């Protein structure tokens, strides 16, 4: 049998020695590549050790392999592809495919779909304001900041969130600073809500109540996917991913509004903040010892409920941490699909306005 194998190989013009030489070459190449990968893994573990593993990752090796699969460079490449201009004659076919595939409501899109020059423009499209009414104007109520699935919500009772769904993060690490002390320990509590925007959703995010902010923090990090399964692979995922945090105040007390990057593009934009650049090349990530970029404005930035705050180029997550009265109640269920402007909780009965809708920049 073996002689027949050699005979067939030699008939094709290859001697047994050249056959084995070729396979030896492939083997050496594979061993070299694996050696480099394991060397980088070892060095990566060293870096985390030097910087005391600020995110308390359970396994640095698991984080390394996840970076290999979902690295920032891959997201930047995707971003460039998404920004390639599509010929006008092809746009209807391309966008209608995604509308059908992702089950996007075409009637809500503000502008004709052929006006979007690229996939990036299409996925960050605007919707008609009149399709998203504000559901509650009570001063201690909160509405959804985005079209999303509300993944989790509740009261913060410590500086570390660890829930049954596997979502874990250190509040201090996540915010890049200590939380400010409550206005009144006896009458208020801190609450949180986590929103996930899938690729099919409207990608702009809005103010969930009237608030003002003076501090913007940009914490560089990874752009790992933020779907539910990733929380089982990487603990403290939100402490690792890149994020932008607005720190300010509202009627109920202090508020932290966080926009978190995710895989495929990783870009976050904040309205009227031209200095903000996310997912930059050759950036030392904050959890590996890089600096946190903090911008303190001369004056407060005031936002009314429903005002546009910013946008993602592809879906990601929003986390709102806010102080409110102790008798605050939620009006939603975990994993519920909600629209921007829809009431998710409050102190009093909803105060539904007439003809009050979200606002966009255009």
Swiss-Prot record:
Reaction(s) catalysed (UniProt annotation): a 1,2-diacyl-sn-glycero-3-phospho-L-serine + H(+) = a 1,2-diacyl-sn-glycero-3-phosphoethanolamine + CO2
Residues annotated with Pyruvic acid (Ser) modification: 316
Residues with site note (Cleavage (non-hydrolytic)): 315-316
Pathway: Phospholipid metabolism; phosphatidylethanolamine biosynthesis; phosphatidylethanolamine from CDP-diacylglycerol: step 2/2
EC number: 4.1.1.65
One Pfam family cited in the UniProt record for this chain: PS_Dcarbxylase
Cofactor: binding details: Binds 1 pyruvoyl group covalently per subunit.
Superkingdom field: Eukaryota
Transmembrane segments: 26-44
Protein name from the UniProt record: Phosphatidylserine decarboxylase proenzyme
Cellular component, GO annotation: endoplasmic reticulum membrane; mitochondrion
Cofactor annotation: pyruvate
InterPro entries reported for this sequence: PS_Dcarbxylase (IPR003817), PSD-B (IPR033177), PSD_type1_euk (IPR033661)
């Amino acid at each position: 049998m073996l002689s027949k194998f050699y005979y067939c190989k030699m008939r094709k013009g290859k001697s047994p020695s050249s056959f084995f030489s070729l396979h030896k070459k492939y083997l050496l190449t594979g061993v070299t590549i694996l050696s480099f990968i394991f060397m980088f893994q070892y060095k990566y573990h060293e870096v985390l050790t030097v910087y005391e593993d600020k995110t308390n990752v359970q396994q640095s090796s698991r984080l390394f392999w996840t970076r290999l699969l979902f690295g920032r460079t891959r997201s930047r490449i995707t971003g460039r592809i998404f920004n390639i201009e599509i010929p006008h004659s092809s746009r209807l076919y391309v966008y209608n495919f995604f509308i059908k595939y992702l089950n996007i409501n075409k009637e809500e899109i503000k502008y004709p779909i052929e006006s979007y020059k690229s996939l990036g423009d299409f996925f960050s499209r605007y919707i008609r304001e009149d399709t998203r009414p504000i559901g509650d104007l009570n001063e201690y109520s909160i509405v959804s900041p985005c079209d999303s699935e509300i993944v989790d919500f509740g009261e913060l009772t410590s500086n570390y969130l660890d829930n049954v769904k596997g979502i874990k993060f250190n509040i201090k690490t996540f915010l890049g600073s200590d939380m400010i002390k409550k206005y009144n320990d006896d009458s208020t509590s801190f609450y949180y809500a986590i929103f996930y925007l899938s690729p099919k959703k409207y990608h702009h995010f809005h103010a969930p109540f009237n608030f003002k902010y003076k501090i913007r923090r940009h914490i560089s990090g990874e752009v790992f996917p933020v779907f539910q399964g990733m929380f089982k692979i990487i603990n403290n995922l939100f402490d690792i991913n890149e994020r932008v945090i607005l720190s300010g105040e509202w009627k109920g007390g202090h508020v932290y509004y966080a926009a978190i990057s995710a895989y495929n593009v990783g870009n976050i934009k904040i309205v009227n903040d031209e200095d903000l650049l996310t997912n930059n090349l050759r950036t030392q990530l904050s959890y590996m010892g890089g600096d946190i970029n903090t911008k303190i404005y001369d004056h407060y930035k005031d936002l009314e409920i429903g005002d546009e705050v910013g946008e993602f180029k592809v879906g990601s997550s929003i986390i709102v941490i806010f102080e409110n009265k102790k008798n605050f109640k939620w009006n939603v269920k975990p994993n519920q699909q909600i629209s921007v402007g829809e009431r998710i909780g409050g102190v009093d009965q909803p105060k539904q306005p007439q003809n009050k809708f979200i606002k966009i920049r255009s």
